[in-house]
Amino acid sequence: MASPALSHFLPRFGVAAAVAGVLSLTGCQTWNAQDTLPPTSGVQPLKGLAQNVSVRRNAMGMPLIESNSFHDALFALGYVHASDRINQMVTLRLLAQGRLAEMSGSSMLDADRYMRAVNLKKSAGELYKASSPRLKRFFEVYARGVNAYLFRYADKLPGDLASSGYKPEYWKPEDSALIFCLLNFSQSANLPEEIASLVLAQTVTNDKLAWLTPSAPDENLPLAEADKLQGIKLNGQIPGLTELSNASEQLAALNLLGTQSSNNWAIAPQRSRSGKSLLASDSHGPLAAPSLWSFVQIRAPKYQAAGVTVAGLPMVLGGFNGKVAWSLTSVLGDNQDLFLEKIRRQGSSLTYEVNGKWQPVAVRNETYFVKGQRPIREAVYETRHGALLNSTQAAAQGTGFGLALQTPSFTDDKSLDAFFDLSRAQNVERASDATREIRAIALNLVFADASNIGWQVTGRFPNRREGEGLLPSPGWEGRYDWDGYADPMLHPYDQDPAQGWLGTANQRVIPHGYGMQLSNSWAAPERGERLAELAGSGKHDSRSVIAMQYDQTTTFAAKLKKMFEAPGMAQPLKQAIDALPEAERSKAREAYTRLMAFDGKLSPTSADAAIYELFLQESMKQIFLDELGPQNSPAWKAFIANGDLSYAAQADHLLGREDSPFWDDARTPQKEDKPAILARSLAAAISAGDSQLGGDRRAWQWGKLHRYEWKNANGQSVRGPIAAGGDHTTLNTAAFAWGQDFNTTRAPSMRFIVDFGQSEPLMGQNGTGQSGNPVSPNYLNGIDPWLKGQYIGLPMQPQNFDRVYGKTRLTLTPGK
């Protein structure tokens, strides 16, 4: 799905690499890495089961769980999740709790402070309390399965976890609600954008912020948002902003759940070759081992489902149940707002201003247990809007601005029950009913049965009295406060449209003037545009849908050419190129000619694709580096981070904004305009290519600049580099940090397709592997199929189980 924040795998903080962990785990020469792999055959007695459960695995290690009761299936799911991904589960839980320093040391303390302030524990408690007794029982049984693994393998944990020295606590049912809340928290891109805007405000004046935070190509600049900050001196007035920005960067590097970027679509029967629906889904994240997603299939009386799960959460979040397919992407809804709070110390108390009066903050105490150090006890301060993300520094300084975070409440929220009901729905109408009850997470849910398709936006979105929430709001006035939430009946939805398809790619999904505030932080529109081009052309089957998932054509290239040829640009640009020094002039002319001939196909072997991407990279530096640089400055880093989260000022300036103040190069005495900067950028693209790819420009290849490289939780390379095509605007996403380098930061971490025209509709692929244990054969075995476009079928009919899963099984039996 799409990207926040803190979009999207797992921590590259200081847990030792698995190989090093294997060598240093106990100092015992007889320790065997293979002992950390639970068996996949034979008999395993486990206390807590009522009856035997069979676990078979396919060639990719994806499990089929067969049981005589749903409770036993959930118990087995907990055991299997822990067997495959215990390090991921433990790390996600610590991340959500704000306790990473316990495993990784003081380097994660700022991130822990950030997450303690966010207080997902409170949100998870509300969500779990509001759930039905049925759902709580499901989570309890799942937790017992996780704990059965922890009890049996306490001394045989995977090397990376064991070498950290951290002893995992037993799993609690509420921990699964916590993982769900973490998934939700990762879905809004706007919180890190708001933090980044404050970092930018330390370098540029408030009136320029609007030029750096556009919403969409056809939207006016958010000048009113910037106006609410007029007269407020932000430079140097936010204690702890550096630490907060560092924490936000750390969380972005961890990528939380890596689901802010994603695609999904459904093809209606009239556009299908078989006359039956199709559904496709792919979610994007860093090239990490393991990826976020874990495939599983469950077959029990009155319940069957297969698809993708997140270890720690006993739900099939996207997949197929034999009748209905469902998938999710991030809607990038904005339901997280930062409020600037005027603070001052009065005696021993910290106070903040509300409508001209000063009142005390609320206080809660937090204790941080830091690996290798004494515990640290600190206060978190809360205003009427929420906790101060910079509590420690604000209290120490006693003046300036606190940063309060407001998020929706989950009181009386039945989202967990609704997600389970979605996985049991037997037709699109029932699926639609279930999705309308999902409030605790902002998603585009696309679903289908053999004859119908549907789409529903879920979540809880605030009604703001004034403002859009795109930039931080003054908290001392009531003008910008929330006034309840949008009526769920206003949430966008559609079913069986005349066009014959539905699809989302994190793009804007509501028209101008829509009756609710959903977001102003949409992704760039190009993936959605390409999806519409392909979905709306001809008839489809699973082969054409696979081709869509692997498509590397960008629609941005055609827009760029249109801009070059626009009546007000063509002649001034030619004149600007002619005015360059001779050496630069010839380079600019070559780049222009090649770009005008470029077909938009970002193949890894394409020379023109290399020139195109070099131009994009160099133009960003030419436009913005003079005011936001140098390249290691906080402002530049914040700007790059914003460009990765939603529609970027880089693209916005290239396609328009001729009156932007950023076209002038502040380093020169004369005033430059857009044609002059574009001419420089064209020449710079060729110079950069000469430097990086050599002098034979016809032999350049995009894939020699742009690579796939998979890394483990410690940031060590485990596979690659391998030439990559595409970029952040292609359906087959291979994003890079625009303005930094061409290293792939985000790519599909899973894909699945449901073709109702097939006797066995579901097929899928994992981005790396099913297991998070480096000694497992299923640790990286998903990469080659991913590179080759190969999917594995997940059959729903029992007579086909042996063909895919074989006859070898692990039998879990009731223990004493």
From Swiss-Prot:
Protein task: Catalyzes the deacylation of acyl-homoserine lactone (AHL or acyl-HSL), releasing homoserine lactone (HSL) and the corresponding fatty acid. Possesses a specificity for the degradation of long-chain acyl-HSLs (side chains of seven or more carbons in length).
Source organism of this protein record: Pseudomonas fluorescens (strain Pf0-1)
Name recorded for this polypeptide: Acyl-homoserine lactone acylase QuiP
Keyword Secreted: no
Family stated for the protein in its record: Belongs to the peptidase S45 family.
Residues in the signal sequence: 1-33
Note: AHL-mediated signaling mediates quorum sensing in many species of Proteobacteria, regulating hundreds of genes, including many that code for extracellular virulence factors.
UniProt key word Transmembrane: no
Domain of life: Bacteria
GO biological process, one term: antibiotic biosynthetic process
